[in-house]
Amino acid sequence: MALQKFPLLGLLFLITIVVSSTIAVDDPVCPTTSKLSRASFPNGFVFGTATAAFQVEGAINETCRGPALWDIFCKRNPERCSGHNADVAVDFFHRYKEDIQLMKNLNTDAFRLSIAWSRIFPHGRKEKGVSQAGVKFYHDLIDELLKNGIIPFVTVFHWDTPQDLEDEYGGFLSENIVKDFREYADYVFTEYGGKVKNWITFNEPWVFAHAGYDVGKKAPGRCSRYLKGCEDRDGRSGYEAYLVSHNLLNAHAEAVEVFRQKVKGGKIGIAHSPAWFEPHDLKDSNDVPTVSRVLDFMLGWHLDPTTFGDYPQIMKDLLGHRLPKFTSSQKAKLKDSTDFVGLNYYTSTFSNHNEKPDPSTPSWKQDSLVAWEPKNVDHSAIGSQPLTAALPVYAKGFRSLLKYIKDKYANPEIMIMENGYGDKLKDKDSVEVGTADYNRKYYLQRHLLAMNEAICIDKVRVTGYFVWSLLDNFEWQDGYNNRFGLYYVDFKNNLTRYEKESAKYYKDFLGQGVRPSALKKDEL
């Protein structure tokens, strides 16, 4: 109401939110508090929730949105999406104002969203048409966030390649994607860069390349027939994932070049998604080095080029001609092409030296000479895994990973773009069962504490944290069977949202302390 009555004050409020949306904590000072809360973190620390366009928006036939890779993947192979699709998803497209009120209820500062490429360019390229209705939707969404005091963090690409580009030249298998992605990124930076200062070019490039083009678990489902479960699928494991990542990295560099010309005062990064690893046998001299080796293959694969300008040396040594080479000009563009390290952390496991891989059946996991083990040499599991949990819970690994990045990459600014707990409920489970998510509450408590220790004790420069996810949503090959939301979505009854116990905890946690939007500019 105040914004409507006093338009000048409203404008100043929006400007304040935009200006204060690029926040750095160079020398974190951690207050002493009686219990862990927002007040336990440095001034200016940003807390939020996250989603992705394909997973929540729905409305696939509105705004002239073109088909995306996952639309076709799930329709052609419904069994590979658990029989589900994202045609409606959780209907965020129509309910975003309602959902922004849920964000406000949580006391969050920020919201991470993604833009659907084919909602802007239905056919993948500007010359083939721009959907002005799609452009307007994201303007309206961003404006509504700002009006409610919530800082938008925007991901340019979250796995939803326009199907037209996939059909035309194979999407990210072709270097043609580099110029098309640059054009798309240029358009969204120009369109929204005056309002949005925090950007991610690519979400989880390791998962996108490995799961989509090496083991075939995610779209487009490509893998070699010698891999278990890939008998009837096209692809070339051990080759295509490296090519896809190479094109993705060059596309990132081109987009960042445009970004730094167009978005003044902004920050940009990539959201990486490594697990943490502990040696299978601490007394085995072959197992101990597997931690750094597998992290080079999982994290360094994309973080080394954007930091140092080239792939990790171990990848070059082990892959040989199968790893594409950057030109000198590409290296120059890639080096220092991120302003912060985006990190998505979920789980940890054990790493074991794999001494004798079969050279006739290459794959990403085999290439690193590392086997992943659920238990160590003493038959102990890593962390805990409740019965409904999708992944083991190991908060210590979160802190260890943060310290690893600090030490290896010269203490960069880090933003936790995703952290969350998935539980696989049964169809018969009631809303009451779904909202009593005490395991998720415990997960958040442990990981927020681990992050606080990394900041305050290890002096890691973490400046923001986003819970995955605001809402239960479409979880790729798991469909709607794997729930990560702070809010329960009743898929059987009008997609009604219900507050979970974890949401109540996060709201209480964030209710204690000063929000960044309430700080003076010189305090940020």
Swiss-Prot record:
One of its GO terms (cellular component) is plasmodesma. The keyword Cell membrane does not apply. Glycans are attached at residues 61, 494. Induction: Up-regulated by salt, 2,4-D and methyl jasmonate. Down-regulated by cold and mannitol. Its EC number is 3.2.1.21. Keywords: Disulfide bond, Endoplasmic reticulum, Glycoprotein, Glycosidase, Hydrolase, Signal. A motif (Prevents secretion from ER) lies at residues 521-524. Disulfide bonds join 223-230. Residues 1-24 form the signal peptide. One of its GO terms (biological process) is carbohydrate metabolic process. Gene3D superfamilies: Glycosidases. The active site is at residues 204, 418. It is found in: Endoplasmic reticulum lumen. It is an enzyme of class 3 (hydrolase). GO terms for molecular function: beta-glucosidase activity. Pfam families: Glyco_hydro_1 (PF00232). Belongs to the glycosyl hydrolase 1 family. Component of the PYK10 complex, at least composed of PYK10/BGLU23, BGLU21, BGLU22, JAL22, JAL23, PBP1/JAL30, PBP2/JAL31, JAL32, JAL33, JAL34, JAL35, GLL22 and GLL23. This is Beta-glucosidase 22. The gene is BGLU22.
